[in-house]
Regions:
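Bacterial N-terminal signal peptides
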Residues: 9-18
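N-terminal secretory signal peptides that target proteins for export/translocation
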Residues: 1-4
């Protein structure tokens, strides 16, 4: 598939003094040097970052400048440090009059990249009226795999079908390995003909290094996009987006995802969805978008007790010009700096969709709420 040539725009912010808080609430600005980049231009992106064994950072992105309402594919882009990026391959090429716009991504135990991808068809379905562009029917997930760092990919239809009465699964978040080497992922689905539009978030497990998957449990009812993080042993943390207030709830499992306890609210309304990461010093990092008017951007929180308590929000991205923004994904470089990627429909004078990146140093003593 031919894609528009992308231009790279770079902005380096030398001091957090240039990053004022956007409201009078408890959130704080970053301290120390901060780098900001418009890294991949003219793409809605919804980035998901994965670090390869050789240290290369891979961003899985949706490659079109639309909120999923035109034909497009999931691509893999590569960077050595999070600053500059180049296209490496097409993870999930779309078929005619369809798109592949959703992705879950991670590493297999053998070092392969494993991604799951879903999308929509634009073809009117039998017995139904025509829906909005590229919203006629959700396509079942593909299982995508690359053994050469994201350059070439294979695809299978080996992801499980949803339980009877539910529509196809829609994937999200990271694919993580547990203590026993099994891979774990999340996806959500909606009841057919449900007037309440009540999503359920499921937990999945693969015992063959990501080649086939099976349903393990429901994480939350009334929740959809869910990030997973392995803590230790059989303990897991999940950060799930709610349907109603549009906030992030935490769930916990002590039995490798067989059962989940929660929810615990961890963000305010219109602050979604989330990403979870473990830092080198043992702390947890939660990053999430905020679509609150006059506060749009990306926030982060740190936890020193496995997610039981969290710091006050730290402002990572600011002045995004539309509520069409957020979906952060974060990794930590060997030098300790955090690379947080996110998407935005525009910022300041730059009015195109893009993947933005902020490179920052986590504070040693984060602010208390």
């Amino acid at each position: 598939m031919n894609t528009p040539k992308r231009l790279l725009f770079v902005t380096l912010v030398a001091s957090a003094a240039l990053l004022p808080a956007v409201n009078a609430g408890p959130e704080t600005a970053l301290t120390g040097p901060v780098e900001r980049y418009i890294s991949i231009d003219n793409a809605c992106a919804w980035p998901n970052l994965t670090v390869l064994p050789d240290g290369t950072i891979i961003a899985a992105i949706f490659n079109r400048p639309s909120h999923g309402q035109e034909a497009g594919s999931i691509e893999a882009w590569a960077s050595q440090d999070g600053r500059f990026w180049e296209k490496r391959g097409v993870v999930a090429p779309h078929e005619p009059d369809t798109n592949r716009m959703h992705v879950a991504a991670g590493l297999a135990q053998n070092g392969d990249l494993v991604m799951l991808s879903t999308g929509f068809t634009n073809l009117q379905q039998p017995g139904q009226s025509k829906k909005l562009p590229f919203r006629d029917r959700l396509l079942p997930p593909w299982v995508c795999r690359s053994s050469d760092g994201g350059r070439t990919w294979t695809h299978t239809n080996s992801f499980p079908s949803p339980p009877e009465g539910f529509g196809p699964f829609l994937v999200f978040g990271d694919i993580k390995a547990g203590a026993d080497g099994a891979l774990h992922a999340s996806a959500y689905a909606q009841k057919d003909d449900d007037p309440e539009k009540e999503d359920r978030a499921w937990h999945f497990r693969s015992d063959d290094d990501g080649r086939t998957w099976r349903i393990i449990s429901v994480i939350g009812t009334g929740h959809n996009e869910t990030a997973l993080l392995h803590l230790e042993g059989k303990r897991w943390l999940a950060a799930a987006r709610t349907i109603g207030p549009q906030q992030v709830d935490l769930f916990r499992s002590n039995d490798d995802g067989t059962t989940w306890a929660g929810p615990e609210h961890v963000s305010e309304a219109k602050q979604i969805p989330a990403d979870l990461a473990r830092l080198a010093d043992g702390r947890l990092l939660l990053t999430y978008g905020t679509r609150v008017a006059d506060q749009r951007g990306v926030l982060g929180k740190l936890s020193s007790d496995e997610g039981k308590t969290w710091s006050a929000p730290i402002r990572l991205a600011d002045s995004l010009s539309s509520r069409d923004c957020g979906y952060p994904s974060s990794i930590q470089r060997p030098d300790g700096k955090i690379v947080t990627a996110y998407y935005s429909a525009g910022v300041g004078d730059h009015t195109r969709y893009h993947m933005g990146v902020v490179i920052w140093t986590p504070p040693s003593s984060p602010p208390t709420p």
